[in-house]
């Protein structure tokens, strides 16, 4: 092996860090390995990049778990024994074209021979909060900026006089009790909003909550070793109503048996079941886009019309009244391995992997009403409600066969390796 290789001390990387997946465990611990979360939504995958986004196609590295491709986020971090990162394109000589952007090699924990059953339980609980949010211009700063823009006749887009608006805001700042609702209609029916509101705080809870639990038992006899593990991860996001959340259950089992001196059989079974609820994008620019683009004077309080109280046109309304998208995934992987050592220095390994992934994706846009931006009337979030359901599965089969022969001639140590790989993947969705 030539080229840049980095190893990760998984115990130090995990420590007491509150993480939900392996991506978070590797974030910031390997120089040159860039791992980013583009959404912050609980359960969303992170993106990987080893040589930078300016590399050809900006591709992601190949991830191998016990020598077989697998979704890195379906592994319980507590099941990992070691992680190695092959950073340069030389790894393609061993793993093929898919490794052109690097390789992440993950080895999971196994039992040890001649060891009494050992039980282990880990947990951690943590809270999350948005640390940095965009700072918006105050209502007065916004109106003064409108004046500097030089609107024709000192009139803003919806017909209100900008100088008059400035006067209302200054009076509101001096005498807020005169404007209990934070807005006023003039004699011509023009609406002047004056109160400064925090769109982000309106749509977020004080904290998000995360918990991880992991239980395992391992051991072995003179000729066998085993390890069983069960893990649970739960994360509630920071949006109101807790509609952004993620739950995952991991189970794994490993068994190794020395049938005789030259034959060893191994069976590795892994299963993961996850459910992700994520807020659908609503409003003119999506939930986060609306919170960012709407001015700070935008009303967030409900408004009564015809004796009925309706919510305002805000991101918080889209979150509270909208239905979340539900994504359910199952991932079952079975790996069987036979290791034969017929001669001194010769080891022949045969592997068969079966992986089945199922996915359920439900999107429902329900219909609800809210008050428009300038209290001009009732609006519908959609003309008609929508429902979409996508279900699918992927079956993956792989065969690996390789042999290593190590021998010495004089003062020279020689190692010869040859291998064969065959993969088949079949995917259906409807």
PLM-predicted stretches and their roles:
Residues 1-252, 264-266:
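Short, small/polar-rich motifs associated with maturation and membrane association
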Residues 14, 18, 205, 209, ...:
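Catalytic cores of large soluble enzymes that bind and process phosphate-bearing ligands
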Residues 26, 31, 292, 296-300, ...:
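Proline-centered flexible-loop/turn and helix-kink motifs
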Residues 93, 214-215, 335-337, 356, ...:
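Short secondary-structure capping/turn segments at boundaries of alpha-helices and beta-strands
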Residues 98-100, 259, 342-344:
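Short loop/turn positions at the edges of beta-strands in beta-sheet-rich folds
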Residues 108, 219-221, 257-258, 269, ...:
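Residue-level signature of outer-membrane beta-barrel architecture
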Residues 113-196, 233, 237-333, 349-430:
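Surface-exposed loop/interface segments of Gram-negative outer-membrane beta-barrel transport/assembly proteins
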């Amino acid at each position: 092996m030539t080229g840049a290789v980095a190893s990760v001390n998984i115990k130090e990387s995990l420590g007491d860090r509150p993480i939900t997946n392996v991506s978070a465990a590797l974030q910031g611990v390997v120089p040159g390995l860039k791992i980013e979360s583009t959404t912050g939504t609980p359960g969303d995958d992170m993106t990987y990049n080893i040589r930078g986004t300016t590399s050809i196609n900006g591709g992601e590295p190949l991830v191998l778990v016990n020598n077989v491709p697998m979704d890195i986020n379906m592994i319980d971090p507590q099941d990992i024994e070691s992680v190695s990162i092959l950073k340069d394109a030389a790894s393609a000589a061993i793993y093929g074209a898919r490794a052109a952007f690097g390789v992440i090699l993950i080895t999971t924990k196994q039992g040890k021979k001649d060891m009494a059953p050992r039980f282990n339980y880990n947990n951690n609980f943590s809270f999350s909060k948005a640390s940095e949010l965009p700072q918006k211009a105050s209502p007065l700063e916004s109106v003064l900026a409108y004046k500097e823009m030089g609107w024709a006749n000192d009139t803003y887009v919806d017909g209100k006089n900008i100088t008059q608006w400035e006067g209302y805001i200054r009076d509101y700042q001096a005498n807020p009790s005169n404007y209990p609702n934070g807005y006023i209609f003039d004699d011509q029916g023009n609406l002047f909003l004056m109160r400064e509101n925090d769109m982000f705080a309106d749509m977020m809870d004080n904290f998000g909550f995360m918990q991880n639990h992991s239980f395992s038992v391992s051991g072995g006899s003179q000729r066998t070793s085993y390890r069983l593990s069960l893990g649970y991860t739960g994360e509630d996001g920071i949006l109101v109503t807790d509609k952004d959340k993620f739950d995952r259950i991991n189970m794994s089992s490993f068994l190794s048996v020395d049938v005789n001196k030259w034959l060893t059989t191994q069976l590795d079974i892994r299963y993961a079941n996850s459910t992700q609820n994520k807020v659908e994008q609503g409003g003119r620019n999506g939930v986060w886009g609306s919170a960012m683009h709407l001015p700070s004077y935008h009303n967030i309080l409900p408004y009564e019309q015809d004796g009925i109280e309706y919510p305002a046109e805000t991101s918080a309304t889209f979150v509270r009244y909208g239905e979340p998208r539900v994504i359910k995934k199952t991932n079952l992987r079975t790996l069987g391995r036979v290791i034969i050592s017929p001669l001194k220095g010769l080891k022949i390994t045969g592997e068969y992997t079966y992986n089945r992934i199922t996915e359920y994706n439900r999107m429902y846009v329900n219909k609800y009403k809210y008050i428009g931006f300038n209290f001009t009337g009732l609006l519908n979030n959609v003309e008609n409600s929508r429902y979409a359901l996508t279900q699918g599965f992927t079956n993956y089969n792989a065969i690996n066969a390789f042999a290593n022969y190590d021998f010495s001639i004089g003062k020279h140590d020689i190692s010869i390796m040859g291998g064969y790989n065959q993969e088949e993947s079949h995917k259906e969705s409807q």
